């Protein structure tokens, strides 16, 4: 299922991801089915999106319903950008003390551009497009009014296919030519890593609990929504016998 997945990237074979971290940001969709009973509906590890709307929604709720927040123990979320920046900085290659972090956006016309700009502003980092970055000697640089500045961590909001025209879609005008060379050389960190979209796939989703047990030796804290893979005989038989209930 992994090798046949459209998001599987053979370009990542034998590539040592900086700091060994593939997914720094995960967007996990949850559904509540009862009191204190939550299920994981979906895993989003490729280019998770939507957190800015949650942050803005919370600000509005606090202004409109202050009594609600004073009467209940509602966990704060305003510090999310600080946690995000700290996470990105910790993933920098070469153990640099003051790494340069940027947010890479497809541009103004992308549907999530507001979030890209919002997070960059909240973290105090540069919002860049592919044309703002260049690769020289397997190192990524940002072109500024003061000259070139090395980039250590890229929080990329661009899909794999458009990241590097040397490696993926040759017609891409959104990515950075040579980015994968710098990535393979361990000179830049991409968040999230190329190929993490495999984990988004619904054919992988049913096996996540088994992955947790195998790799962590633990029982999953949250349940998965029951999912049937019809390429497996037992699941197919169950689905055919219970179509009216599904």
Regions found by a protein language model. Name each.
Residues 1-246:
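Domain-scale recognition of functional cores that engage charged ligands
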